[in-house]
Amino acid sequence: MLVWLAEYLTQYYTGFNVFSYLTLRAILGILTALMMSLYLGPKLIRALQRMQIGQTVRDDGPQSHLSKSGTPTMGGLLILAAIFTSTLLWADLSNKYVWATLFVIGSLGVVGFVDDYRKVIRKDPKGLIAKWKYFWQSVIALVVACALFFTSTQANETSLVVPFFKDVLPQLGLFYIVITYFALVGTSNAVNLTDGLDGLAIVPTILVAAALAIIAYLTGNVNFSNYLHIPYLPLASELVVVCTAIVGAGLGFLWFNTYPAQVFMGDVGSLALGGALGIIAVLVRQELLLIIMGGVFVMEALSVILQVGSYKLRGQRIFRMAPIHHHYELKGWPEPRVIVRFWIISIVLVLAGLATLKIR
């Protein structure tokens, strides 16, 4: 929004041209989202406490979690507000990639909000029934996938980048819609499953978003993209601002979500953030790289799939409890140890993912 204003004012004072620089807007994006989160965080927490919107804890999980009962939830509203405000202020709103990302974040945020509302306000332990949650996630993913596919104007927008291989860019055709669908729905649910311990989901989200910001910048720069043998997508560079807004909002939320948490993000935050990572990876054509960088999310989701599959097929469980972070808690690991070790794994995987841009 302010980009347009700066363009107009530049004719009167050339100094306003500084706001056309992507790096400056990225920095302002992260600072705006961070400061907004830090300022509004205490106010939101008090409001949630006043309305008695607190987390309900299952009694069949780790006993240490019982003390978390009643902790304010739906803090994801703070994250989404900061992301939207920062992006709308500093991004170029004529860019379709920006709007596609905001649509995914907002629509999945609505799905998560309905789920949280039913759980914590209407006291329905099931929340939004799983089949309906999956239905709306699918509708959102398919709408976005089809819209992007049928409005694509260059071959690079629908090619698949294969990590470790130089100039291997197979055209996906209609399979692009399938890939996009699984990237959005899969990542959204994976982040949702990871959000079970204080700060466990938000830090990997911040790390992956920061890495995607770097990739978006490289992809949107013709010189860097040619040097690294990745598709050149001029619209992708504006996603840097969205990614830095996610990083800033995430850091601000972490201030209140770190152990012991003062607030949880709830499904309104986790579903939206997962969808954000998924759609950005799709737009910069790095869906496969997201599997590496988001390895913690993949590990959490796979642990649930394996646990359920094993129990249905063999009548036996593989883990003491799934998602896998609860397995380690039941083995006797203190919660902070589980959290920090998963953070370390995420740092290593994100760095490994970035390294693949050069190792080809």
Swiss-Prot record:
Biological process according to GO: cell division; cell wall organization; peptidoglycan biosynthetic process; regulation of cell shape
Protein name: Phospho-N-acetylmuramoyl-pentapeptide-transferase
Enzyme Commission number(s) from the entry: 2.7.8.13
Top-level taxonomic group: Bacteria
Membrane topology per record: Multi-pass membrane protein
Catalysed reaction equations from the record: UDP-N-acetyl-alpha-D-muramoyl-L-alanyl-gamma-D-glutamyl-meso-2,6-diaminopimeloyl-D-alanyl-D-alanine + di-trans,octa-cis-undecaprenyl phosphate = di-trans,octa-cis-undecaprenyl diphospho-N-acetyl-alpha-D-muramoyl-L-alanyl-D-glutamyl-meso-2,6-diaminopimeloyl-D-alanyl-D-alanine + UMP
GO terms under cellular component: plasma membrane
Function: Catalyzes the initial step of the lipid cycle reactions in the biosynthesis of the cell wall peptidoglycan: transfers peptidoglycan precursor phospho-MurNAc-pentapeptide from UDP-MurNAc-pentapeptide onto the lipid carrier undecaprenyl phosphate, yielding undecaprenyl-pyrophosphoryl-MurNAc-pentapeptide, known as lipid I.
Lineage, opening ranks: Bacteria, Pseudomonadati, Pseudomonadota, Gammaproteobacteria, Alteromonadales
